[in-house]
Amino acid sequence: MQWNEDVCIVSGDNRAWQDGGEPKTVIELWCRSRDGHSTLLLVNGLKPYIEISDPSTDEDSSESKLSLEKVSATKDVRGDPVSNGMKLSTRDGKVRPHYRVFVRDTTKVRGVRKALSGIGWTVTSADILFVQRLLLDLDLGPHVRMSGEILWAGDRAPEEAKTPETTDREMAQSRIIEVGGSGLYPLDMVVSCDISGLERADPFPAPFVTLSFDLETSIADNTILCAAAIVDRAGKRTEYPIKGAETDILEKLTEVVRSEDPDFITGYNIDNFDLPRMEERSEGISPNSESDRAPLLGWGRVPMSESEIKKGWRRPGRIFPSREQNRTWTIKGRIPLDAWWQARQTLRPQRESLKYVSKLLWPDDEEMHKMNIDASKMDEEWAARPDEVLEYCVRDAVLPLDILDNLKSIARKEALASVSLTTVDIAATSTTSRWIDSLVIRLADREGVAVPNTNQGPRKQGKIAGGYVHEVDPGVEPWVVVLDFKSMYPSIMISNNICSTTLVRDDSEDKSHSVSPTTSTRYISKEERLGLVPQLLEGLMDSRDIHKSALAKANEEGDKDEAFLQDQLQYAVKILMNSFYGVFASNFYRFTHPSLGASITEWARYNIKSIISKVEDEGHKVVYSDTDSIFVRAPVDKGSPKNRPSGAGDLEKWDKAKNMSMEFGESLAERFTKEGAELEFETALSSFFSHGAKKRYVGRVVWPREEMLIRGYEVRRTDSFQILSDIMTQMFEMILDGNTIGAVDMTKSVIDRIREGDVEPAQLVISRSCKGRWDSKKNEWDFDSVYANPDGLPYVRAAKQRIAAGLQFTPGMKVGYIVTKPDEGDKKLGIRAWLVDEIGGEPPDYDKEYYAGRLAKSLGRVTDAFGWDEKNLLKGTRQDSLDKWF
């Protein structure tokens, strides 16, 4: 039975198989359909291949000196090389003939590549995953329209897809194997199609299914006491509280995963606790039999068959979750998306416990806060009140779903996949270079550019000079306009045609070349050859404008769903564009060169310095500049109020100053904009302050919205503590108002309160990231191999204390602690881990002098600009009158 529908590709893989003795490779695409059911596509018709060229050839001498017959005779090569035309090599900038070489299957590519390199050929396009190859060659993204034959239709499949043939399990399994599949996959539908049955579809919000789970485990012996899973299917949630014998718990949880068939699997800290613990316990229960372990942890979206259970080369069977070198997990066909990591990356919270993050997101909603169970005494809690512990476990499984919803994490991953034209799992869990690869390689294939292998270029390079930062004088400046370069690095790359495909590698010179201002690196003109990167960036900039226009239209028409989709897409384009410089300035990317990043920052420094010079020549004061922003004093009437006044007369003066600043900012942006350096009037400030250090300033924004702008100070550092952030913010408000005496008096009063012990300890918690390595031989956390003096580091000592209390530790997590008075005779700081959020109890007593000193040191850097340094704040006496500063 034929079937057509739109689907979103969640993940992909491939399998080698034999079709009547002929080797073939089938691509498995795990998808979620527009209508909500899951579909596995088995795609045949694409053959694995690499490309080769003879490095001795070029445009003028295209006859190869190397033997093509030897290529054909190479082990695991299928057939003769096929001419693939003339292609540009980014290795040396020469155009030469290239040939396509077909390989028996994807597992043989590495060997063929090594063999052909060994006899002199330059091998390209040889490290591209086969699923990615499919998307590249067919110019597909994650959203596709497919046409194929239904092999299986389960209970949740559309009724019109169900026939006696498609619902017969034995018949379906046989038909799936006949086209290269592994067996009956645990999805709603399995469809077979040829590559001709796939085409790109317009983006749509796929109705993904997400499963969140949590475990409660014994402190004494690590056994699993209970578990909970919550499945979110199109907004409808189903709860699965699970208890019983440990084996039963694991089997039931696996049964839920395989029957509910989620695309995303989440939880809080599942990467570092729940998944490793399940792996550990399943191996403990069935140490010698992978087949016995499969019902305990067979979460992969593949058949529970012998071929999928048995170990591969250096990897477990595909049915089992697998931990990668970067500590992330893969579950074949599904996407593990840890809510802890998403919250950490998006919110950058001072503390990272689930309870703290929940209160951060929903401060006034007690229902959203974690229940009070002492996790450090879980064995006692389980023995005394198992029902409450199970309820606690269920709540811990619900909250990650709420966190992902609040952060729009899944929608943003899908939008990024749509923009970068990758499968959703690549957008969700992979690196920026993989996203950019997807765009650059398909354009390179179209433009006749050979695709080098990763790591082929130089591995080491000197540090690239950063952007220009203008010196800033200490003090307050009234009425300042901020000009930003629009998409500065992308604009420079576009206007100067910067790309590895346009870099002039010899000593030739031409008037048409773009020449970098410092090192005189040359790039050929757009007329001679438009670089891959400028082409892509221009396309992305245009597409972002289209999405933003569509967003505005949807908002006008009240179409919330369309507005949400377009907003996610334009944001994804922004993320992708901002990633280009970092990738192309790196020393690992396949299309990079050491000159590229240096050229970009050269032009950036040149552009901003030239504009500063012109502005100052006109008599305007440049207060500050930083990489892509310029702060200029606006010519407003002297004595204009810096804060919005309440009186009508002063309000008129304030409005006049605001309007004059806005007109001035617009005129500067218009006059100094040029190709590759488009200026935008970004912000108007009624007051600007810095204590004289680069990258540290504050301002009161009056346009386009009214808010406080703070950059570089402890307020924005996650290793600060709450009262310091709060007081610094209040102090800046006073300083911007001109009330410096009041700011200093307030600072002194808070220092006095700390010395008197009149501050809540929760406001003094310091959080720092802490690394560690699990020593499986000793069955304990090892910090000595990570830090030279771990016991001298307060956050390591705090981490050890939370481990000793039976609480989770995750390498890289933020560990909260309070500084206490040192023990008698001990020269080190006293440290007590902050565990109140997780297990309750009385907070530790803090070291009053330490915190008074820390506050004085941080705030003194600011008030020193008016004659009040750290020592004077602690003493309560000032050096000089403040009036001279204003």
Feature map (PLM): residue ranges:
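Conserved RNase H-like, two-metal-ion catalytic cores of nucleic-acid enzymes
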Residues: M1-G79, L184-N269, E280, I285, ...
